[in-house]
Amino acid sequence: NDGALPSEPFEGGDRRQVLQVLSAMVGGGALAAVSHSAEAKDASELPPPKRALTGRNEAGKSVFKSFDVTSKVVEIDANPGLTFYELYRTEGVPALTGLEPDPMLPGTKGFPGPGGTIFRLISYPPKRPEGYKPPPGVTLESGLKELSDKLPGMGDHFDRSAPGMHTTDTIDYGVVVRGEMTLELDDGKMVHLHQGDCIVQNGTRHRW
């Protein structure tokens, strides 16, 4: 990269993109960001996020290393519409030399290591209608296995006795970018979240 500006400018009026940038500044944990309400269209309607990755050149000047749609898009076949956009991760405290290779090139991870972070955008499918049946052959175990196969270890954290409930050893910073979603905790209390609402999940058992 010669340090020139990307050929396609940022869309300043797009609230979703602005919130993605703010979320990246917060860092830490596994970031849940996007949802759709019961009236929302299929998750495929959401444009894949573009990622501007910065670094430094050999002269120490700041440059754009890339500006494109992330190649790490994970779709869960057992839950059509559930899509993870893996944007960036760190392992431990980064040196910030600006010369580091893109950490997303090797593959995906379910969670960061000690002191690390993961920046991801999650698109949840709309609320299922009453009587909805999963795709043929899909069971709870097969669905969680697929989740762990595609995002290593993630399916292991789900409670088999209470579908959807899960606990992770992370602090998750979340922003509802579009749509609405409901967060439920152990005591049965729920909070209904709207566009722009934020969540700090302190390693607590929960479901969406």
Specify the residue positions occupied by each region the protein language model found.
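N-terminal secretory signal peptides
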Residues: N1-D14
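N-terminal twin-arginine translocation
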Residues: E11-Q20, G28-A43
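C-terminal segment of N-terminal export signals and the immediately downstream linker at the start
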Residues: A33-K65
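Short, conserved beta-strand element in jelly-roll/cupin
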Residues: S123-P125, H166-T182
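A short beta-loop-beta micro-motif enriched in histidine and acidic residues
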Residues: P136, D159-I171
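Short beta-strand His + acidic residue motifs that chelate non-heme Fe in jelly-roll/DSBH
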Residues: L183-E184, H206-W208
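Short acidic-glycine-tyrosine-enriched beta hairpin
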Residues: D187-N202
